[in-house]
């Protein structure tokens, strides 16, 4: 194995003791009838917020509240607590998918890199969107890093650039061959979540989740994933930018799925693609929309 791949695997393994997988696969199984987990996952997040607020010594600063929620539902390991819970819980319906039977199957190790070893994670339906389990970690842990840097005084452009750098080197392009635009969207929406705890209109036309009242923070409205999850969380609808060796093989695999896509195009199209691209382009997305089903299959 060449030195570059040995180094890649050493780096990956050092971070993957508690990992479920590096990437997810939203290309296959799109037509499966899977229950939407919006309500049950809303409940998990709201319970975590309530637990932080109702503790014996609840935090009284924005930094403390954000850290408390992250500790409750995020975590220092590769897979966040909510990600591990969702993967195990019978309350969360999953798409039928095996870790090594994915869009990446039969691809060589030099194309798929770490995915060749770890396979892919589970996918769920959330707010009508097919979402990989890894997006929970991006939302809570990477979003928390963005927010923490904001509190330290980093400019928006600087913290967004650091997020793109991490996707390029640690979390994505170097180790998996994939620069995930959907990961960056989840990071960004996670940052907005932490902001929306304290600021009005971060979520359009909604007050902050919390309000300062009588010397403490109290919740004035519930959290819902519907404020943050959209089609650009879906790796197939918001395609990643891949290394050439992977992209060439991935496009062939997508072509093989075109008959299914033509039978039920609604499962394979982004109805508001240009709106979402415009909304998120500034966060560091790399345009690879030529890999959308619409472009490859002529939908």
Segments and roles (model prediction):
Residues 2-10:
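Sec-dependent signal peptide recognition
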Residues 9-12, 144:
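Residues in flexible loops and secondary-structure boundaries
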Residues 14-18:
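N-terminal signal peptide c-region/cleavage motif recognized by signal peptidases
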Residues 20-161, 171, 175-184, 188-299:
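Intrinsically disordered, low-complexity, mixed-charge
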Residues 167:
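Acidic-residue sensor for enzyme active/binding pockets
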């Amino acid at each position: 194995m060449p030195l570059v791949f040995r180094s890649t695997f050493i780096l990956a393994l050092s971070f993957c003791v508690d990992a479920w997988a590096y990437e997810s696969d939203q290309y296959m199984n799109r037509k499966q009838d899977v229950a939407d987990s919006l309500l049950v996952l809303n409940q998990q997040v709201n319970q975590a917020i309530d637990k932080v607020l109702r503790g014996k010594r609840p935090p009284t600063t924005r930094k403390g509240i954000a850290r408390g929620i992250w500790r409750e539902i995020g975590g220092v390991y590769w897979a966040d607590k909510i990600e591990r819970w969702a993967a195990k819980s019978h309350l969360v319906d999953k798409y039928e998918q095996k870790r090594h039977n994915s869009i990446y199957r039969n691809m060589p190790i030099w194309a798929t890199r770490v995915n060749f070893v770890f396979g892919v994670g589970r996918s769920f339906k959330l707010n009508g969107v097919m979402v990989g389990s890894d997006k929970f970690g991006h939302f809570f842990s990477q979003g928390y890093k963005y927010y923490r840097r904001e509190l330290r005084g980093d400019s928006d452009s600087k913290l967004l650039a650091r997020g793109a750098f991490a996707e390029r080197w640690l979390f994505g392009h170097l180790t998996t061959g994939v620069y995930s635009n959907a990961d960056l969207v989840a990071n960004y929406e996670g940052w907005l979540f932490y902001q929306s705890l304290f600021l009005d209109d971060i979520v359009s036309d909604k007050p902050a989740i919390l309000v300062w009242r009588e010397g403490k923070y109290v919740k004035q409205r519930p959290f819902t994933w519907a404020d943050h999850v959209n089609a650009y969380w879906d790796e197939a609808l918001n395609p990643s930018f891949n290394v050439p060796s992977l992209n060439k093989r991935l496009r062939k695999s997508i072509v093989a799925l075109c008959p299914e896509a033509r039978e039920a195009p609604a499962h394979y199209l982004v109805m508001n693609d240009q709106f979402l691209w415009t909304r998120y382009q500034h966060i560091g997305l790399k345009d690879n929309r030529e890999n959308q089903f619409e472009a490859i299959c002529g939908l």
